[in-house]
């Protein structure tokens, strides 16, 4: 016997945060960003056999302003990285990134100067999906896990304050799993640099600055070259 028994029929009780997050996770719209062979598996997942419309994402959006999920399907070249960042910046808030396949996540077998060694050097990644290429079932599983993450995200300024309070108490890590670029994880000094940037709220600035410093041909345009 709860309060629901005393209310008129047709009344549903919930918190605004849970309701908004439920609506967000139930209508995740993906942006078309296929780069290599992983895109073929992404196309297969979007077909009628797997019926992704069950989760409200049966259509991939051609405009980033109408999308809130970027699935990076394939390796990212150095020339494609600025385009990827521009599309990410044009996406609606809140937005999420799923790195599909080992090439997008760490460069994979393309360990050379032409390929970005992990898309997390360019944009923040919310979910990593291994495989070369991962099957459509694996992509759907990663999307379902991302939906659960969306469901528990804080909402609004009060929610962010609560999340910061939890971080201060040590209830959750200062740097959420998956947000730190892969090249920072093996170096203690760089990990400390990233953690400090997260505390100061400038991790995106640090991510872009480090990527630009690694591109000598772009430094002259950004005024970074001394």
Curated annotation (Swiss-Prot):
Catalytic activity: a quinone + NADH + 5 H(+)(in) = a quinol + NAD(+) + 4 H(+)(out)
The name this protein goes by in its record: NADH-quinone oxidoreductase subunit B 2
Topological type in the membrane: Peripheral membrane protein
Highest rank taxon of the organism: Bacteria
Origin species: Salinispora tropica (strain ATCC BAA-916 / DSM 44818 / JCM 13857 / NBRC 105044 / CNB-440)
Entry similarity comment: Belongs to the complex I 20 kDa subunit family.
Keyword terms of this UniProt record: 4Fe-4S, Cell membrane, Iron, Iron-sulfur, Membrane, Metal-binding, NAD, Quinone, Translocase, Transport
Enzyme Commission number(s): 7.1.1.-
Chief place of localization: membrane
Cofactor binding note from Swiss-Prot or TrEMBL: Binds 1 [4Fe-4S] cluster.
Function field: NDH-1 shuttles electrons from NADH, via FMN and iron-sulfur (Fe-S) centers, to quinones in the respiratory chain. The immediate electron acceptor for the enzyme in this species is believed to be a menaquinone. Couples the redox reaction to proton translocation (for every two electrons transferred, four hydrogen ions are translocated across the cytoplasmic membrane), and thus conserves the redox energy in a proton gradient.
Self-association state and partner proteins as the record states: NDH-1 is composed of 14 different subunits. Subunits NuoB, C, D, E, F, and G constitute the peripheral sector of the complex.
Residues the record lists as binding [4Fe-4S] cluster: 37-38, 103, 132
